[in-house]
Amino acid sequence: MTIKTLADGTSYTKAHAHDWEDPDCTIKGRVKIYRKIDGIRAIRNKIGDVWSRNSKPLPHCDHLNFQDAEIFRNSWNETSSILGRIDAPTVALTQENVYELRDGFIDPRLYIGWADNPSNENLEALMHKYIAQGDEGLIVRVEHKGKVLWWKIVPYKYADVIITGFKEGTNKNKGKCGSIASNWGSAGSMVEDCLQDHNIKGDANIRTWLWQNRNSLIGKVMQVRYREKTEAGKLRFPSLVRLRTDKNEESFD
């Protein structure tokens, strides 16, 4: 879990992906399990305007009651289409399309149940059950040292893609790699052991190394994991898994 901020300083919680494929990586303690619906995150800033997590205005939501919510109507594509255009939809969004996410105020429609020390196998099975019903996966929330940690349980696909460029990070990542570009989208997050072949550990060190070596890496192949391909053929939420020095061709699951 990470506490992130919008451009005006409004804070919100971002869930971290739980690596349920790793048998050594488990979630401990009593947890509450929720549906992760495949919508668009919408957050009210300090003056009440509705922004995306990238601090971009989201239209057609001002009449809805929420502070930090997932907006969802029928599918991610339909929701994205509504919030991505200036002209109002034929049928306005309603409160039924709003799923509040704040701790203590979470929409009861999202709640599945609780568990003690859930196994990765059980989480995977539950994830696939709800994906079959149209959800994106699960969110597991667990109290830890007075805070509520958010873990997302989502499926992964893998692809080997050619690196086409690098973008410098901002704020704490200034002077480091912010994202790695490919023809299929940009990877802005890095798996913890993505540079284990180079004995580089820690997000800051990984981003520093990538930025320092960016010129020699352009044209090389990186392995990314992602959720799915969009209708435009882009990868949703790609993350760097490792550099593929043994390959020079692209491939997809």
What is each PLM-predicted segment?
Residues 1-47, 165, 187:
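RNA/tRNA-interacting regions in translation and RNA-turnover enzymes
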Residues 3, 110-158:
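Amphipathic alpha-helical
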Residues 25-107, 252:
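Covalent nucleotidyltransferase
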Residues 29, 35, 65-76, 139-142, ...:
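Flexible glycine-rich surface loops and low-complexity tracts that mediate binding to linear polymers
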Residues 49-56, 182-190:
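Catalytic Cys-His active-site segments of thiol-dependent hydrolases/isopeptidases
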Residues 75-97, 185-253:
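Intrinsically disordered, low-complexity regulatory tails
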Residues 156-172:
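Structural detector for short beta-strands of small beta-barrel domains
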Residues 170-181:
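Short aromatic-glycine-enriched beta-strand elements
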